[in-house]
Amino acid sequence: MKKPEYVAAVTAMYRKYVDLYLKKGKSGYAVKPEDRENLMDLYNRGDSDTGYYKQHNGREMLALDRPNHAGVAAARCLSQNGREVTAQALTDLHAHDVLEIGSGKDNYTLGKKITKGEKLRFLVPKGMRFKEGFVFRRIRNEELIESLDQKYRKE
């Protein structure tokens, strides 16, 4: 079962693009990058999956390497000095977003908003090493979850 915010966002996005296609036709139809990223923030098994666009069923559609949420590319490692990692934001990040560092208990929760292109610094557990260029993934977009909760919450 999917979480309510996932169902609400996917259904709303589907409706939006069905309406757009019916209104403008194939030539006027294009998915906005921010809409795609929002969907991937909610649940993403990997950036390369095309879903049912190009095929129906088959082993290629299974996420064998990573069956859980893969998140979105969020920050690229610039350097590491001891436990402190310096990274550059690849997308806008929000307070309380969660970056995957290692296993679940080692994830990093941001304390403030970071704009795309800005540098951020955070501590990683002792013994963890990250090479320059390593991409940390956001596995929880708190601002998106909160906005969906506000929009669809039953009073």
Stretches with model-predicted labels:
Residues 1-155:
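Surface-exposed amphipathic alpha-helical tracts and adjacent flexible/coil segments at the periphery
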